[in-house]
Amino acid sequence: YGWSWMIPEEIVEKFYCVMLHPSPLPKYRGGSPIQNQIINGEKESAVTLFKINKDIDAGDIIYQEPFSLEGDLKEVLGRIVEVGSYLTNKMIYNFYNLDLQKQDHDKATLYKRRKPEESEIFIEDFNTLTAEQIHDKIRCLQDPYPNAFITCKGGTKLYLKKSDYERH
């Protein structure tokens, strides 16, 4: 996960190339799918195993398996690895009997990879966002990603590596 380059078209045409993407494609195509889903308030996602084509995350779907976005980022990433391994083994075992499904491109959403400066939480956010929204922004930007931060007086950055949130 985290592949940021397009595989050359001549490779895609010559070989049966597949990829795992941590979103329920066609939704959340492109970069930073985990962060974008959590920031958008999604609670559930899916790992999608798909056949690569020339477009970004737009190939035919081989398998798609749901997983929860709840918990800290380490837990979420662990679930993604577990589901991705399961789907890869399933594909290898059933390779000659795969039933690929076309993506509904009309339902596609495409996101760019988040930039470190987008990890900033502004003081105004505490007046406009809910506690859950701020918590989600902090937890989806835990290591190994650029952590959420607040810029303090004098330009010093206070990094927010973890938050706890209690629903009432």
Residue ranges and their predicted role:
Residues Y1-L110, E120:
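Donor/substrate-binding cores of folate-linked one-carbon enzymes
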